[in-house]
Amino acid sequence: MTLNLCVLTPNRIIWDSEVKEIILSTNSGQIGVLPNHAPIATAIDIGILRIRLDDQWLTMALMGGFARIGNNEITILVNDAEKGSDIDPQEAQRTLEIAEANLSKAEGKRQVIEANLALRRARARVEAINAISY
């Protein structure tokens, strides 16, 4: 038995295919979803989506949004997403270093909040590359 997973951004469809299982970062922690999961709607945090095909795990960096799960259908609507395999490791590492430097230089609440969000996005991209296969 499988799940139909659809990952959408405002500009494009990132993924639309059958999967065996996913692990999703929500605002209240990670959840695993297998076939016949109870219906839920949840907010998605900036983080990693792990996707299990037959015997292979793939990763995707998600930049926050919402998910709806029910009847073996998973629809994920996010601000932005990138497949781990599409992320350039050197560019992601540089972006992480810049985000860390910007956070240390941030002054005022607004700059600190924006720098923290940029750092979380950069960490999610690096984690998507470095995620260990299960």
Swiss-Prot record:
Predominant subcellular localization, coarse grouping: plastid
Localization: Plastid, Chloroplast thylakoid membrane
Keywords of the record: ATP synthesis, CF(1), Chloroplast, Hydrogen ion transport, Ion transport, Membrane, Plastid, Thylakoid, Transport
CDD domains: F1-ATPase_delta
Classification via Pfam families: ATP-synt_DE, ATP-synt_DE_N
Single GO MF descriptor: ATP binding
Topology of the protein relative to the lipid bilayer: Peripheral membrane protein
GO cellular component, one term: proton-transporting ATP synthase complex
Assembly with partners or alone: F-type ATPases have 2 components, CF(1) - the catalytic core - and CF(0) - the membrane proton channel. CF(1) has five subunits: alpha(3), beta(3), gamma(1), delta(1), epsilon(1). CF(0) has three main subunits: a, b and c.
Purpose: Produces ATP from ADP in the presence of a proton gradient across the membrane.
Listed NCBIfam families: ATP_synt_epsi (TIGR01216)
Protein family: Belongs to the ATPase epsilon chain family.
Alphabetical list of HAMAP family matching this protein: ATP_synth_epsil_bac
This protein's name: ATP synthase epsilon chain, chloroplastic
